[in-house]
């Protein structure tokens, strides 16, 4: 699975890069310190997964997602758990990791990313029609 990291903090990128290197199925293509560089890259390259920090100086992670026409799967990374509810308003966001990220938790998020999307069953409404 081809992935990129977008995080304005060098330490954050290094830690997530190390976590990626421990997952054989991940191919880390690039790391970006800002969303603008990443947008240019995504316009020319195919990516399956974005590991995206929420707090960045030029864009928030949510602002960045809004710029994407067909976003790939996204795992949000942040030191702030306050955005979790907002995160799941986006279909492309498959997980939300709070820093510091435990290796086991990272692996679990990657497994979710690798899983095929679940098919939502239509709800069946029961009608009690009187004849």
Regions of interest found by a model, annotated:
Residues 1-3:
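Extreme N-terminal starter segment of soluble prokaryotic enzymes
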Residues 5, 31, 76-77:
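Conserved SAM-binding loop
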Residues 7-8, 53:
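Acidic di-acidic motifs
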Residues 10-30:
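Two-component/phosphorelay signaling modules centered on CheY-like receiver
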Residues 17, 31-49:
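Acidic, metal-coordinating helix/loop segments flanking the phosphotransfer/catalytic sites
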Residues 39-41, 48-121:
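CheY-like receiver
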